[in-house]
Protein backbone atom coordinates (compact mmCIF):
# COMPACT_ATOMS: atom_id res chain seq x y z
CA UNK A 1 0.00 0.00 0.00
CA UNK A 2 1.14 3.53 -0.78
CA UNK A 3 -0.16 6.04 1.77
CA UNK A 4 0.47 9.60 2.86
CA UNK A 5 -0.22 11.22 6.19
CA UNK A 6 1.00 13.18 9.17
CA UNK A 7 3.00 11.34 11.84
CA UNK A 8 1.62 11.64 15.38
CA UNK A 9 1.96 9.90 18.75
CA UNK A 10 5.43 8.61 17.86
CA UNK A 11 7.07 6.43 20.48
CA UNK A 12 10.02 4.08 20.29
CA UNK A 13 10.03 0.88 22.31
CA UNK A 14 12.48 -1.96 22.77
CA UNK A 15 10.88 -4.93 21.05
CA UNK A 16 11.90 -8.57 20.76
CA UNK A 17 13.93 -7.85 17.61
CA UNK A 18 15.38 -4.46 18.53
CA UNK A 19 13.88 -1.00 18.61
CA UNK A 20 10.43 -0.46 17.15
CA UNK A 21 8.78 2.85 16.27
CA UNK A 22 5.03 2.90 16.78
CA UNK A 23 3.08 5.90 15.52
CA UNK A 24 -0.17 7.02 13.99
CA UNK A 25 -0.45 8.05 10.35
CA UNK A 26 -3.30 10.54 9.85
CA UNK A 27 -4.57 11.67 6.43
CA UNK A 28 -7.72 13.36 7.80
CA UNK A 29 -9.92 10.57 6.42
CA UNK A 30 -8.64 7.88 8.79
CA UNK A 31 -5.91 7.26 11.34
CA UNK A 32 -3.84 4.08 11.02
CA UNK A 33 -1.32 2.74 13.51
CA UNK A 34 2.04 2.05 11.90
CA UNK A 35 5.31 0.44 12.93
CA UNK A 36 8.87 0.77 11.67
CA UNK A 37 11.76 -1.49 12.62
CA UNK A 38 15.15 -0.32 13.88
CA UNK A 39 16.76 -0.23 10.42
CA UNK A 40 13.90 1.92 9.12
CA UNK A 41 14.15 4.20 12.17
CA UNK A 42 17.90 4.69 11.67
CA UNK A 43 17.61 5.33 7.92
CA UNK A 44 14.69 7.76 8.26
CA UNK A 45 15.20 9.44 11.62
CA UNK A 46 14.81 12.89 10.01
CA UNK A 47 11.35 11.92 8.67
CA UNK A 48 9.89 9.91 11.52
CA UNK A 49 8.97 12.83 13.77
CA UNK A 50 5.65 14.12 15.10
CA UNK A 51 3.81 16.49 12.74
CA UNK A 52 5.90 15.42 9.74
CA UNK A 53 4.20 14.71 6.40
CA UNK A 54 5.43 11.36 5.04
CA UNK A 55 4.60 9.11 2.12
CA UNK A 56 5.02 5.44 2.99
CA UNK A 57 5.03 2.07 1.29
CA UNK A 58 3.57 -0.29 3.85
CA UNK A 59 2.13 -3.73 4.31
CA UNK A 60 -1.19 -3.98 6.13
CA UNK A 61 -1.21 -6.62 8.85
CA UNK A 62 -3.69 -7.79 11.45
CA UNK A 63 -2.99 -6.28 14.86
CA UNK A 64 -3.15 -9.02 17.53
CA UNK A 65 -3.56 -6.52 20.34
CA UNK A 66 -6.35 -4.24 19.09
CA UNK A 67 -8.07 -6.66 16.73
CA UNK A 68 -7.78 -4.07 13.93
CA UNK A 69 -5.06 -3.49 11.38
CA UNK A 70 -1.58 -2.03 11.56
CA UNK A 71 0.80 -0.81 8.86
CA UNK A 72 4.29 -2.27 8.70
CA UNK A 73 6.42 0.43 7.06
CA UNK A 74 8.74 -0.73 4.29
CA UNK A 75 9.81 2.61 2.76
CA UNK A 76 9.44 6.26 3.75
CA UNK A 77 9.74 9.46 1.69
CA UNK A 78 9.22 13.13 2.32
CA UNK A 79 7.14 14.97 -0.30
CA UNK A 80 10.01 16.15 -2.56
CA UNK A 81 11.58 12.66 -2.53
CA UNK A 82 8.21 11.08 -3.35
CA UNK A 83 7.79 13.51 -6.26
CA UNK A 84 11.21 12.38 -7.43
CA UNK A 85 10.49 8.69 -6.97
CA UNK A 86 7.06 8.58 -8.59
CA UNK A 87 7.09 11.56 -10.96
CA UNK A 88 8.04 11.01 -14.59
CA UNK A 89 8.89 14.64 -15.47
CA UNK A 90 7.98 18.30 -14.91
CA UNK A 91 5.93 19.82 -17.75
CA UNK A 92 6.43 23.58 -18.02
CA UNK A 93 4.18 25.54 -20.38
CA UNK A 94 6.03 28.20 -22.37
CA UNK A 95 4.54 30.47 -24.98
CA UNK A 96 6.98 32.99 -26.34
CA UNK A 97 9.12 33.25 -23.18
CA UNK A 98 11.52 30.53 -22.14
CA UNK A 99 12.26 30.02 -18.44
CA UNK A 100 15.78 30.55 -17.13
CA UNK A 101 16.56 26.83 -17.20
CA UNK A 102 20.28 27.17 -16.41
CA UNK A 103 19.61 29.31 -13.33
CA UNK A 104 16.81 27.06 -12.06
CA UNK A 105 18.92 23.92 -12.44
CA UNK A 106 21.87 25.65 -10.76
CA UNK A 107 19.67 26.82 -7.85
CA UNK A 108 17.93 23.42 -7.44
CA UNK A 109 20.35 20.71 -8.64
CA UNK A 110 19.49 17.02 -8.43
CA UNK A 111 20.53 15.38 -5.18
CA UNK A 112 23.47 13.02 -5.28
CA UNK A 113 23.11 9.79 -3.36
CA UNK A 114 25.63 6.99 -2.95
CA UNK A 115 24.18 3.51 -3.44
CA UNK A 116 25.65 0.04 -3.77
CA UNK A 117 25.53 0.51 -7.55
CA UNK A 118 27.42 3.83 -7.38
CA UNK A 119 26.33 7.45 -7.42
CA UNK A 120 22.67 8.13 -8.18
CA UNK A 121 21.28 11.51 -9.24
CA UNK A 122 17.80 12.06 -7.80
CA UNK A 123 15.90 14.59 -9.82
CA UNK A 124 13.14 15.10 -12.35
CA UNK A 125 13.66 15.77 -16.05
CA UNK A 126 11.96 18.83 -17.55
CA UNK A 127 9.79 19.10 -20.66
CA UNK A 128 8.90 22.46 -22.14
CA UNK A 129 5.47 22.58 -23.79
CA UNK A 130 4.61 25.13 -26.46
CA UNK A 131 1.05 25.56 -27.71
CA UNK A 132 -0.17 27.87 -30.45
CA UNK A 133 -3.77 28.37 -31.43
CA UNK A 134 -5.19 30.19 -34.41
CA UNK A 135 -8.67 30.59 -35.87
CA UNK A 136 -8.70 27.19 -37.52
CA UNK A 137 -5.36 25.70 -36.56
CA UNK A 138 -3.78 24.54 -33.32
CA UNK A 139 -0.30 23.17 -32.81
CA UNK A 140 1.57 21.83 -29.79
CA UNK A 141 5.12 20.64 -29.25
CA UNK A 142 6.91 19.26 -26.21
CA UNK A 143 10.68 19.50 -25.88
CA UNK A 144 12.46 17.14 -23.47
CA UNK A 145 15.47 18.87 -21.98
CA UNK A 146 18.61 16.79 -21.45
CA UNK A 147 19.95 15.12 -18.33
CA UNK A 148 21.74 18.36 -17.42
CA UNK A 149 18.32 19.99 -16.83
CA UNK A 150 17.27 17.60 -14.06
CA UNK A 151 16.34 19.30 -10.79
CA UNK A 152 15.27 18.23 -7.29
CA UNK A 153 11.52 18.97 -6.90
CA UNK A 154 11.43 20.81 -3.58
CA UNK A 155 8.59 23.23 -2.86
CA UNK A 156 10.90 26.18 -3.56
CA UNK A 157 12.04 24.66 -6.87
CA UNK A 158 8.47 24.07 -8.02
CA UNK A 159 7.50 27.62 -7.04
CA UNK A 160 10.39 28.97 -9.13
CA UNK A 161 9.41 26.91 -12.17
CA UNK A 162 5.76 27.96 -11.79
CA UNK A 163 6.77 31.63 -11.52
CA UNK A 164 8.53 31.40 -14.89
CA UNK A 165 5.94 29.26 -16.68
CA UNK A 166 3.31 30.72 -19.00
CA UNK A 167 0.32 31.69 -16.84
CA UNK A 168 1.92 29.78 -13.94
CA UNK A 169 1.29 26.43 -15.61
CA UNK A 170 3.82 23.82 -14.53
CA UNK A 171 2.93 20.33 -13.36
CA UNK A 172 4.60 17.11 -12.35
CA UNK A 173 3.43 14.27 -14.58
CA UNK A 174 3.18 10.98 -12.72
CA UNK A 175 1.83 8.73 -15.46
CA UNK A 176 2.16 8.92 -19.21
Model-based region annotation:
Residues 1-176:
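Primarily single-stranded nucleic-acid-binding OB-fold modules
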